[in-house]
Amino acid sequence: AYGSCIGWGSFILPGDWISQSGSIAAAIGITIGALLMIIIGVSYGALVKHFPVSGGAFAFSYLSFGRYVSFFSSWFLTFGYICVVALNATAFSLLLKFMMPGVLEHGKLYTIAGWDVYITEIIIATALLLLFTFITIRGAQVSGSLQYYFCIAMVVVVLLMFFGSFFGSGFSLSNLQPLAEEKKGWFTSIIMIVAVAPWAYVGFDNIPQTAEEFDFAPNKTFKLIVYSLLAAAGTYVLMILYTGWLSSRGAENSDLWVT
């Protein structure tokens, strides 16, 4: 669940959040978002305890309200995941395009919203999708083990970046200013981040989706969800602070991905 919550957004979006809301306001907003998600986690924990089956929201809505409610709620949830899959599938290509712009700019297909799309990007994104599809088909044990090691590696990298930032040449607490966007004020600055927080924590609900495969008591689900959300919130806050005190506001506005 932690690995699903933390994706490319935690490394790409802190600069945008700081620019829109200010550093501390962004950190507060993303923390409030986690607390709101925990309320949903309470519901999931109670449902898993009563319905320890796989399927997540689909199974719960079907068992509680019948096929029609389950049909519509599950499709709306599916549409949400389709958006996330599209973003994650193109994230690696997007990162390569930013780091090595000349390498992927071959075979231009079209321009949308001022962004050029190349066939090389699509090939890379498709290859990664097929790779992870194959891993998923192999079974939960294989994919679960890989995700576990990926999460460990990500936590180590985040901690190294955060604590290493204290020794960076650009480190300065004054760079955190303004703590909140001056024109918008604290309330609006925080609410703007709270509004996008549900997207930032998408994925924590994958724990209930595999409840039937648990080798522990279902009542532990709530604790797992809460711990995952708190860990994800901590990661977001660390990346916001890391970005904030290592970059001035001017650099933030000129760089695409200041983090």
Protein language model regions, located:
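Membrane-water interface regions at transmembrane-helix termini and the short interhelical loops
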Residues: 48-49, 72, 127-153, 210-213
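Select transmembrane alpha-helical segments in multipass membrane proteins
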Residues: 1, 27, 66-79, 125-126, ...
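Short amphipathic alpha-helical coupling elements at transmembrane boundaries
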Residues: 49, 56-63, 70, 145-148, ...
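Helix-loop-helix junctions that connect adjacent transmembrane segments
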Residues: 27, 103-120, 148-259
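Hydrophobic core segments of alpha-helical transmembrane domains in multi-pass membrane transport
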Residues: 33-36, 128-136, 155-165
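Extracellular loop-to-transmembrane helix junctions
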Residues: 10-113, 228-234
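The first (N-terminal) embedded transmembrane alpha-helix
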Residues: 1-12, 199
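Transmembrane helix-loop junctions and nearby membrane-interface residues
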Residues: 38, 45, 88, 92-95, ...
